[in-house]
Amino acid sequence: MVILGTQSATTREQFANWGWRIPFLLSMILVSISFYIRLRMRESPIFSRIKASGMTSAKPLTEAFTVWPNLKRVLISLFGAAAGQGVICYTAQFYALFYLQTILKVNPKTSNIIVALALLLGMPFFTLFGALSDRIGRKWLMMAACLLSILSYIPIYKQMQVAAGNNIVTVRSTTNKLTGAINLTPFTTDATGQQVPAEEASNPNIPMLVFLLFVQTIFACMIYGPIAAYLVEAFPARIRYTSLSLPYHIGNGVFGGLLPLIGLTLCARTGNIYAGLYYPMIVAAITLVAGSLLLKETYGTLIWDEYNQANQTSPTAD
């Protein structure tokens, strides 16, 4: 919304020259608020009780990543949940925006409006699927998101092309010799059947495009809603924060964060406008297989029982 507002307040040239810096500057407000909240946050009751009882880990990094049972949980959580969550969420937001602007030649302002509307419509479903996972479980809801993404990404993006109104048949790439940046030029066919550079989409079907992005947002909600509860329930409190940080941040920062670059590279190398989707589909497939076989259902786990059980078995419990 901030980017959209900035684009509306500036011309295209102004935004390209200096306007793009405004959202980054405004983000300092959010950083300040987040920092303030973090300073005032208290530890969870269970961790406070464990800390008071002297049951915390002296070396959480060592215990989390060198003790095999804990490392096994980390790896299963990464490949069986977080990696798929990362690419599914990034596809719904960032890759969809790249596809609209770069491949389908939809006006940047219009593209941002489409993405913003889809995200606004999808926001309540993050809570809905989180609550649903409290009733039916986490694992298979997350696996369903992976399966639906694998099966539907190509059809969805084909329909996005139809809705945009540009008959894009291929893309060609050029590389800036100075910076190494890859630029994509989409091509369509003219009346004689010759391939020509595509013009900006003149009359995109905005409601249909919003709906198609909303569907992708639903997939993201299906896996993102339950994953926070799953990660908390998957690790013991004494090393929980350290342990869940690795799969979550690698899943989002690496697997998800590399999606735009890998998607762009695949399209550039192949000329196939759908090739960029192969990467999130493959990662989602890995998560589907690994999660289905190895992920334990944590629904119903009473995380405070960990303290009670440890306290009962402690020689100083009496």
Spans of model-derived segments:
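Helix-loop-helix hairpin linking two adjacent transmembrane segments in secondary transporters
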Residues: 1-37
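Multi-pass alpha-helical transporter architecture, strongest
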Residues: 34-41, 156-163, 282-309
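Flexible cytoplasmic inter-helical loops of multi-pass small-molecule transporters
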Residues: 39-62, 301-310
